[in-house]
Structures are given as structure tokens and as C-alpha cells.
């Protein structure tokens, strides 16, 4: 089976390059499409900050996340069609985006700590609820 419309769930970490490389290896032979989705930190979780600072912090986090995605895409050596920056529960956004854009494969990373432990929980929810195939890639960190 070949996949032509792939959604890759990435985090703002170097290991995301491994996920995108896996997607490229699957998409390139069939000239498939790749899109990225990531979870941005929501400054509202830092409730000790004053309300006016939250919007500024949200904007900075959005810009940093977009810059990371831009660099990831630049280094991919393959075109990326769309990027999605989500807030909140990643698995819900993945399922919604899959339905809306008709992805036929979701690629997620499996890591034992930090962001990816949360992402792997999201991956479990995606696997349980997904209507498309999900590839869980073991990640090697430095």
C-alpha cells in the first residue's frame, strides 16, 4: 500500500527531523504530499502572568514554533504542503485535521521522556480513534 497524503506530528525538538525524514521516504516514491502538525505551548498555563503579557507571550511562542517548522521544512529536501500549529489536546487536532484534509497516514514519534511522553499519550488516543493508518516511529535522542 502506498500513502499519498501524510500528516506528521512533530515537536519543537531535533528528533522531529527523524519523523519528517520517514515521511519523505514514504512520500517521495509516489510523489505524495506531506503536512506537519505541532503543539504550541499555551501561555495560559502560566497563570501567574498578567493578562496583557499572555497575548504577547502567545505571539512569541507562535513565532518561535513557526520558525522551527520553517527550518524543518527547509532542511527536509522535499516540499511540505501545509503546517498546522495547535493549542490544547494534540490528538483531537490530529483527528480533526485528518478528516478535513483527507490524510491517509499519520506519523507520530515514540519517545520515553519530555514532550514526547505527552505526544505518545496523544499517539495512543490517535491510534484508538483514527480512521486512517498511524505509523509510530521510535525516536533516538542525543
Curated annotation (Swiss-Prot):
It holds the Pfam family Usp. GO terms for cellular component: cytoplasm. Its main location: cytoplasm. SUPFAM superfamilies: Adenine nucleotide alpha hydrolases-like (SSF52402). Keywords: Cytoplasm. The keyword Cytoplasm applies. Required for resistance to DNA-damaging agents. PANTHER family: STRESS RESPONSE PROTEIN NHAX (PTHR46268), UNIVERSAL STRESS PROTEIN C (PTHR46268:SF16). This is Universal stress protein C. The lineage of its organism: Bacteria, Pseudomonadati, Pseudomonadota, Gammaproteobacteria, Enterobacterales. The gene is uspC.
Amino acid at each position: 500500500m502506498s500513502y499519498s497524503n501524510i500528516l506528521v506530528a512533530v515537536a519543537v525538538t531535533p528528533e522531529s527531523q527523524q519523523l519528517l525524514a520517514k515521511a519523505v521516504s514514504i512520500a517521495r516514491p509516489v510523489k505524495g504530499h506531506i503536512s506537519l502538525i505541532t503543539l504550541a505551548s499555551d501561555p495560559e498555563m502560566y497563570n501567574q502572568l498578567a493578562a496583557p503579557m499572555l497575548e504577547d507571550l502567545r505571539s512569541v511562542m507562535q513565532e518561535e514554533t513557526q520558525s522551527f517548522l520553517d527550518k524543518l521544512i527547509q532542511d527536509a529536501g522535499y516540499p511540505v504542503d501545509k503546517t498546522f500549529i495547535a493549542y490544547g489536546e494534540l490528538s483531537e487536532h490530529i483527528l480533526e485535521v485528518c478528516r478535513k484534509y483527507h490524510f491517509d497516514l499519520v506519523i507520530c514519534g515514540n519517545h520515553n521522556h519530555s514532550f514526547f511522553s505527552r505526544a505518545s499519550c496523544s499517539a495512543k488516543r490517535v491510534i484508538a480513534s483514527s480512521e486512517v493508518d498511524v505509523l509510530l516511529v521510535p525516536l533516538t535522542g542525543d
